[in-house]
Amino acid sequence: MSSYENHQALDGLTLGKSTDYRDNYDASLLQGVPRSLNRDPLGLTADNLPFHGADIWTLYELSWLNSQGLPQVAVGHVELDYTSVNLIESKSFKLYLNSFNQTRFDTWETVRQTLERDLRACAQGNVSVRLHRLDELEGQPVAHFHGACIDDQDISIDNYQFTTDYLQHAVSGEKQVEETLVSHLLKSNCLITHQPDWGSIQIQYRGRKIDREKLLRYLVSFRHHNEFHEQCVERIFNDILRFCQPETLSVYARYTRRGGLDINPWRSNTDFVPATGRLARQ
């Protein structure tokens, strides 16, 4: 259980509650969650963040009417900057997108600008939005995370409660290495509903070599942990930086979609450019 799971800032969320589905545009449906909820317990404040990054959203169920009433469909790509005051709560995002369904817009650009304006207002930070026609995406191959997969280790695990203990003394040797490690076994639970969130994670670092067994045990310990996707990625980044002390570090997770949305947060303290192709489970 997260230390802020019952925080009053979460009381007003529609997540976990019965809601009506509106199909006429309503920006008030969007709800933000303060990033400070998970950053404060980690000792992180807006002026001392050890990373940069973004939350990348893919919008698969986006539709509206053109000026003549003909339905339009698109796939949306949203990048929400890490410095925003709030992250966007995903159920509210879904409800907000549903409100476009029976709303007329003159142009695709009007839709893009509307999304960008409303998301910026909710997040209180920088947001960029791109809309793709379906034929732009046809034939794109399923992507994969580059790196060494650490999942096929012959180890026994019987503890699935979150702990940072596995990262203590998880580095060895004085030689600096540079490697990229990948796991598809990341599973956490929604902060409010406790529904499972499934993801793949890529960890790039330069520093003393990290013990792969200990790293995998640490990642598996998220299995009963309740936090939003973005919060888990920041926690993982902060924990590895704290206990393993790499010179450079990048953490990037791509989660399976829910409600027509997938969330793909990344955090880094170096020059990192995330690949945005969807993975096999997305």
Curated annotation (Swiss-Prot):
Role this protein plays: Catalyzes the NADPH-dependent reduction of 7-cyano-7-deazaguanine (preQ0) to 7-aminomethyl-7-deazaguanine (preQ1).
GO BP term, pick one: queuosine biosynthetic process
GO cellular component term of the entry, any: cytoplasm
Chief location category: cytoplasm
UniProt cross-references to HAMAP family, sorted A to Z: QueF_type2
Gene3D superfamilies noted in UniProt: 3.30.1130.10
Keywords in alphabetical order: Cytoplasm, NADP, Oxidoreductase, Queuosine biosynthesis
NCBIfam families in UniProt: QueF
Molecular function in Gene Ontology: preQ1 synthase activity
Binding-site positions, substrate: 88-90, 229-230
Keyword Oxidoreductase: yes
Classification via InterPro entries: GTP-CH-I_C/QueF, NADPH_dep_7-cyano-7-deazaG_red, QueF, QueF_N, QueF_type2
Residues at the active site: 190 (thioimide intermediate), 197 (proton donor)
Catalytic activity: 7-aminomethyl-7-carbaguanine + 2 NADP(+) = 7-cyano-7-deazaguanine + 2 NADPH + 3 H(+)
UniProt cross-references to Pfam families, sorted A to Z: QueF (PF14489), QueF_N (PF14819)
Gene designation: queF
Subcellular location: Cytoplasm
Designated name of the protein: NADPH-dependent 7-cyano-7-deazaguanine reductase
Subunit structure: Homodimer.
Organism: Salmonella newport (strain SL254)
Superkingdom, taxonomy of origin: Bacteria
Enzyme kind, highest EC tier: oxidoreductase
Similarity comment text for this entry: Belongs to the GTP cyclohydrolase I family. QueF type 2 subfamily.
KW S-adenosyl-L-methionine (keyword) present: no
Pathway: tRNA modification; tRNA-queuosine biosynthesis
Catalytic activity, EC: 1.7.1.13
Signal peptide: none
